[in-house]
Amino acid sequence: MENKSLIGQVTQEQINSWKAKYGSVFYTTADNRIAYFRKPNRKELSYAMRLQDDPLAMIEMVLKSCCIGGDDTFIKEAEYLMGASALVEKLISVKKTEVGEL
C-alpha cells in the first residue's frame, strides 16, 4: 500500500491492534478512499451461505459485517460495494482438503 494519505486511512498502530484482535486485516481502495475488513466469523459465514441465491445481498452482508474501519463509502454506495465484491472471495477463503475412503 502506498504512503499517500487516503480518506479513511488509519495508523499502523490501529492496524496492528486489529491484527492482534482479528488475525488478518484486509483492505480495499478506490478513488483515494480506503476501508478495512476482517474475516467473517462462523455465524456470519452461516448467514452468508443462506444468501447464496442472492449474490448482491451476500456481498453486502459480508462487507457490512466485516468492515472494521476506514471510509464507509464502500458499504454505503452500490458502485463501491460492487467494486469491493472481489474482496469477499478473500474474506471467505476455503482451505483445500483431501478426502478419501478407508
Residue map of PLM features:
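Short, basic/low-complexity N-terminal boundary segments at the transition from targeting/disordered tails
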Residues: M1-K19
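Short, surface-exposed, charged amphipathic helix/loop patches that serve as local interaction elements
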Residues: A20-Y22, T29-L102
